[in-house]
Amino acid sequence: MKIYGVYMDRPLSAGEEDRMMAAVSAEKREKCRRFYHKEDAHRTLIGDMLIRTAAAKAYGLDPAGISFGVQEYGKPYIPALPDMHFNISHSGRWIVCAVDSKPIGIDIEKMKPGTIDIAKRFFSPTEYSDLQAKHPDQQTDYFYHLWSMKESFIKQAGKGLSLPLDSFSVRLKDDGHVSIELPDGHEPCFIRTYDADEEYKLAVCAAHPDFCDGIEMKTYEELL
């Protein structure tokens, strides 16, 4: 397993954007051109290039020659590399990517105040009870731990919104370990949280417990 990250401390330069646009597919270029905000296009480009760079490094490929497909529920994959599973997430200034030999999910969330009201609608009764039991000063922090863990689980399962958020429960214990109450018939999986930034929560869900130790940071130059 590998986790790669890029922190956007500045916008892409015109030259960097042009080189990345030249490496991605025509469909991705068109998607980037349709974004109203340039930073959204840059996040999309960087996420695409993170995957290309990871695949190229692992398999000795030309990054620009990699083609992507889409599974039934919209999860991207590389048809030529059936043993390479990956997932991308971005929020705020962060773009992260997880790569493994088995299905994997990753989610990063920038924390914002005043968002925990949606917990009762989307979280399981167990999760909502855990959240309510936290001190008010800790509730936003724990809410985003729950949200990122649940999103990583759904992305690992690869079933999109067909898997309701309240159909399973996750719990972050005081020692940092995560317990999961799985939906009926679901394959075993494991979740770990990572420290990316004090303003963000990051979680990875994998089919095995052998997580990597941390995030391997990449610069714009390393993606070109």
Swiss-Prot record:
State the NCBIfam families in the record: pantethn_trn
One GO cellular-component annotation of the UniProt record comes to: cytosol
- UniProt record, GO biological process: antibiotic biosynthetic process; fatty acid biosynthetic process; lysine biosynthetic process via aminoadipic acid
Q: Which cofactor does it need?
A: Mg(2+)
Family, as annotated:
Belongs to the P-Pant transferase superfamily. Gsp/Sfp/HetI/AcpT family.
Species of provenance: Bacillus subtilis
- Protein's UniProt name: 4'-phosphopantetheinyl transferase
Q: Which reaction does it catalyse?
A: apo-[peptidyl-carrier protein] + CoA = holo-[peptidyl-carrier protein] + adenosine 3',5'-bisphosphate + H(+)
User: What, per the annotation, is the impact of changing residue 195 to E?
Assistant: In strain: A13 and B3
Keyword Transferase in annotation: yes
- The EC number(s) attached to this protein equal 2.7.8.-
Q: Which InterPro entries match?
A: 4-PPantetheinyl_Trfase_dom, 4-PPantetheinyl_Trfase_dom_sf, AASDHPPT_N, P-Pant_transferase_sf, Ppantetheine-prot_Trfase_dom
Query: One MF term from GO for this chain?
Result: magnesium ion binding
Where do the record's region annotations for Peptidyl carrier protein binding lie?
158-189
Going by the UniProt record, its keywords in alphabetical order are: Antibiotic biosynthesis, Magnesium, Metal-binding, Transferase
Pfam families, per this entry? AASDHPPT_N, ACPS
Function of this protein?
A: May activate the peptidyl carrier protein (PCP) domains of surfactin synthetase SRF1/2/3 and iturin A synthetase, by transferring the 4'-phosphopantetheinyl moiety of coenzyme A (CoA) to a serine residue. Required for the coproduction of the lipopeptide antibiotics, iturin A and surfactin.
The impact of changing residue 69 to S is: In strain: A13, BBK-1 and B3
**Binding-site list for Mg(2+):** 107, 109, 151
